[in-house]
């Protein structure tokens, strides 16, 4: 049954499912990436401050090996000397430890982002189940981790062995060099060896990152029924409903604005409302509303109209009536046919004047808007 259930999970996880998994601490992690970048950070710190650390180490070794009769006879003085050497050692190592801690905390953010979840550290009896433990031991994930560990050990051993083989004479010469020079040269060899190891691990780490991400997505896959159930659950969420309605309004507004350039005329009020009308006598039974809006939306409609050189007519009663009693994409109400007919007649006269010249057509006034359709109270509305 479990196999059938897994086989049915053919759909990619939704954003909601991914977010829920994240809240539970389930995000892709690559230990190999963390290890490699920590090694790289350590090498970078050694490269920057290694020489000064080598000099401090040489001085500490010389001081520690210096024979002093006073220290042998004075236990307190000896303890103070040992404490001072330990303090100097810790101070010298602070840059390395601090850098490694910062990298160890920052690297996981590359894959899963910043996450502080208490779910991952909660006590769970299922994790202590011997059967579940055996399943994890013999799972494909465990097999992949085993093969990865073997490959990593083999690769690191092979790269390190080749490096030692090629640099063996230089390593032998360190034995005859002065202590400070020998420490500096040894440090350079260590940095170079680590760099070679990092470069050798890079392809494997890249594969591991890809594997961890795909495994995480595969583990969260859903069945079609789970997606339907999730959608139904989210439909009841008022926040989700509000977000969906907001997105729908934004999409409708974008579509509406995209049609403004097709309008024959824009009727305005002149600051509160704007309605874009289109009429094609061969294809339409009545004029159609392409766009309408109040406030900022009305202003944008007027701006688009000006950009496309669409005639604008200030007719407050008609603009209010069209805004309140018509819908975008629908024909205007029959009660407004007469008023809109006068507007369209003016538009046609305006087009003829632009082609042929002559007297400028007079804008229509006192349009016949029936009582009850014109709401004289001008409100600043937003669509």
Curated annotation (Swiss-Prot):
Domain of life: Bacteria
Gene3D superfamilies registered for this protein in UniProt: 6.10.250.2080, secretion proteins EscU
Alphabetically ordered keywords of this record: Bacterial flagellum biogenesis, Bacterial flagellum protein export, Cell inner membrane, Cell membrane, Membrane, Protein transport, Transmembrane, Transmembrane helix, Transport
Chain segments carrying region Disordered: 1-27
Record's bilayer topology term: Multi-pass membrane protein
Transmembrane segments: 33-53, 91-111, 146-166, 187-207
Entry keyword annotation includes Cell membrane: yes
Localization of this protein: Cell inner membrane
GO annotation terms (biological process): bacterial-type flagellum assembly; protein secretion
NCBIfam families, sorted: flhB, PRK12468.1
Family membership: Belongs to the type III secretion exporter family.
Its biological purpose: Required for formation of the rod structure in the basal body of the flagellar apparatus. Together with FliI and FliH, may constitute the export apparatus of flagellin.
Name of this protein: Flagellar biosynthetic protein FlhB
Organism: Yersinia enterocolitica
Gene expressing this chain: flhB
